[in-house]
Amino acid sequence: MSVTSTVEENHQKNPSTPAAVEEKKKRRWVFWDRRWRRLDYVKFSASFTVHSLALLAPFYFTWSALWVTFLFYTIGGLGITVSYHRNLAHRSFKVPKWLEYLLAYCALLAIQGDPIDWVSTHRYHHQFTDSERDPHSPKEGFWFSHLLWIYDSAYLVSKCGRRANVEDLKRQWFYRFLQKTVLFHILGLGFFLFYLGGMSFVTWGMGVGAALEVHVTCLINSLCHIWGTRTWKTNDTSRNVWWLSVFSFGESWHNNHHAFESSARQGLEWWQIDISWYIVRFFEIIGLATDVKVPTEAQRRRMAIVR
């Protein structure tokens, strides 16, 4: 066994060892001075493909393709926010299993990874927010917290250890199936779009639509920890960014979210647009969503910043 592999195993067992901390200091630049794993190549290749398709999109423009972009962005984006984030990561509401799985599958098509991977990373983010162990810590720079952290799986292991915080998802066959077959679903989507509308639908759907949604999601990790307003006393740098709320389906009320992590509602004021909450509320009204969590008045008073 090589010395390198021995060190990596020590990182995985104890991400707080001096060797692991020193490794974190050395590995800010994710494209060199490091060992690339197969998962890193897969994620980088997927990202490169999505952005390349987006750059090709102007050459294949049609009005119908523009509608495909809107549908892809909306279905995938709401899948991420309603399913991966509020339902699976924070358990802020419950729905029947058939609906839970359907929403998760919509999120999978946003090309942001499988539920187990996404939810685990997000739970670690809340556990270690803005610290050295935050998977996408803003302390390591805007571009790292925005996108570059995705391409270094070993660095994530050195920070947080193995994905031991998603046993609730690992116990379910559906999420294990998606984790093992995610690439086939994305490829299938590509062939389906090509069958319906050729390269026009592929470039505008999986290119423009997916790229926009990826960067809006990433702005929550980067921009919403750097710029914006604060309403609540949280032990982090989370911010509310009002102009991003429509595009993020309500996710950019990020200081609200970090103050009340388990809340299904993130736009806590009537004027704070939160499309994801409107979807959850609709499910609740028609009897599909139960145990919907929102902060109490006492909790809001306790967390409010006195001005």
Curated annotation (Swiss-Prot):
This protein's domain notes: The histidine box domains may contain the active site and/or be involved in metal ion binding.
Native source species: Arabidopsis thaliana
Enzyme Commission code(s) on record: 1.14.19.75
Lineage: Eukaryota, Viridiplantae, Streptophyta, Embryophyta, Tracheophyta
The keyword Signal is annotated on this UniProt entry: no
Motif (Histidine box-1): 85-90
Region (Disordered): 1-21
Membrane topology summary: Multi-pass membrane protein
UniProt similarity note: Belongs to the fatty acid desaturase type 1 family.
Polar residues bias spans: 1-17
Induction data: Up-regulated by cold.
Cofactors (names): Fe cation
Motif (Histidine box-2): 122-126
Knockout-associated phenotype: No visible phenotype under normal growth conditions, but mutant plant display a dwarf and sterile phenotype when grown at 6 degrees Celsius and also show increased sensitivity to freezing temperature.
Binding residues for Fe cation 2: H125, H225, H254, H258
Source species, domain of life: Eukaryota
Catalytic activity: a 1-hexacosanoyl-2-acyl-phosphoglycerolipid + 2 Fe(II)-[cytochrome b5] + O2 + 2 H(+) = a 1-[(17Z)-hexacos-17-enoyl]-2-acyl-phosphoglycerolipid + 2 Fe(III)-[cytochrome b5] + 2 H2O; a 1-tetracosanoyl-2-acyl-phosphoglycerolipid + 2 Fe(II)-[cytochrome b5] + O2 + 2 H(+) = a 1-[(15Z)-tetracos-15-enoyl]-2-acyl-phosphoglycerolipid + 2 Fe(III)-[cytochrome b5] + 2 H2O
GO molecular function, one term: oxidoreductase activity, acting on paired donors, with oxidation of a pair of donors resulting in the reduction of molecular oxygen to two molecules of water
Chain segments annotated as transmembrane: 53-73, 99-119, 182-202, 204-224
Keywords: Endoplasmic reticulum, Fatty acid biosynthesis, Fatty acid metabolism, Iron, Lipid biosynthesis, Lipid metabolism, Membrane, Metal-binding, Oxidoreductase, Stress response, Transmembrane, Transmembrane helix
Additional detail: Substrate specificity shifts from delta-9 to delta-7 desaturation when the protein is retargeted to the chloroplast.
The protein's name: Delta-9 acyl-lipid desaturase 2
Tissues where the protein occurs: Strongly expressed in flowers, roots, leaves, seedpods, and inflorescence meristems.
CDD domains: Delta9-FADS-like
Entry binding sites for Fe cation 1: H85, H90, H122, H126, H257
Function, as annotated: Involved in delta-9 desaturation of fatty acids. Plays a role in the production of very-long-chain monounsaturated fatty acids (VLCMUFAs) in seed lipids and in membrane phospholipids and sphingolipids. Is an essential component for cold adaptation. Is essential to adjust the acyl composition of organelle membrane lipid composition in response to cold stress.
Pathway(s) per entry: Lipid metabolism; polyunsaturated fatty acid biosynthesis
Compartments, as annotated in UniProt: Endoplasmic reticulum membrane
